[in-house]
């Protein structure tokens, strides 16, 4: 079982700019395919993609995003409280990677009631999203951007399930389940 740290007790309150914020938490390397998240937001009126993370592909991503101006904001590495403030403000978390392990970032977003859109074929991330309940797993033949748009329309309905799902992965709950497994071996 996996666990995640709790939301910090004190997080900054971010200015409400009346824009629709989507967020991606990722290392900035080619296989994470952040370009797909940029493309998904580029056509949305009043939307902003907050890109949190850094990596050797950052300059290429900044160049790719340049035509979209302030629709894409690169935050680089941020403190835990600031990361959670960005998640709290977000409507969706986008994870367009085609190869991913279990999704800690998915659960961190879910702690704030923020659903994640990711590829079903990405691997372990499919274990951290309950498709159509806590987020969306993009299936073969579906377009990432279209699924993002569809999921935005269901965000409020998914938020309570996302929060409840994330609570399963507190260290306390993870430890309780682990102890139960060990106890069953005796």
Identify the residue ranges that each predicted region occupies.
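Carbohydrate-associated surface elements
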Residues: 3
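Aromatic "clamp/platform" in nucleotide-sugar-dependent glycosyltransferases that forms part
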Residues: 98
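Nucleotide-activated donor-binding/catalytic signature segment of Leloir-type glycosyltransferases, i.e.
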Residues: 61-78
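Conserved acidic donor-binding segment of nucleotide-sugar-dependent glycosyltransferases
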Residues: 130-142, 149-154
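Short hydrophobic beta-strand element within catalytic cores of glycosyltransferases
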Residues: 115-119
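A short, well-ordered alpha-helix in the C-terminal region of glycosyltransferases
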Residues: 156-169
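Conserved donor-binding/catalytic core segment of Leloir-type glycosyltransferases
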Residues: 13-32, 38-42, 50
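Short alpha-helical donor nucleotide-sugar binding micro-motif in glycosyltransferases
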Residues: 77-78, 85-90
């Amino acid at each position: 079982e996996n666990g995640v740290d709790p939301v910090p007790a004190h997080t900054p309150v971010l200015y409400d700019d009346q824009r629709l914020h989507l967020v991606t938490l990722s290392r900035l390397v080619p296989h994470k395919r952040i370009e797909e998240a940029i493309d998904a937001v580029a056509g949305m009126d009043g939307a902003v993609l907050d890109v949190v993370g850094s990596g050797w592909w950052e300059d290429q991503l900044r160049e790719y995003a340049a035509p979209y101006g302030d629709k894409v904001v690169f935050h680089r590495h941020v403190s835990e409280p600031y990361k959670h403030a960005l998640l709290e403000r977000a409507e969706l978390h986008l994870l367009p990677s085609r190869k991913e392990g279990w999704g800690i970032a998915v659960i961190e977003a879910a702690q704030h009631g923020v659903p994640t859109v990711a590829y079903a074929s990405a691997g372990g991330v499919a274990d951290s999203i309950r498709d159509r309940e806590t987020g969306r797993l993009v299936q073969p033949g579906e377009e990432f951007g279209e699924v993002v748009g569809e999921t935005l329309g269901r965000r409020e309905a998914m938020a309570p399930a996302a929060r409840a799902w994330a609570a399963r992965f507190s260290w306390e709950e993870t430890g309780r389940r682990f102890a139960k497994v060990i106890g069953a071996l005796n």
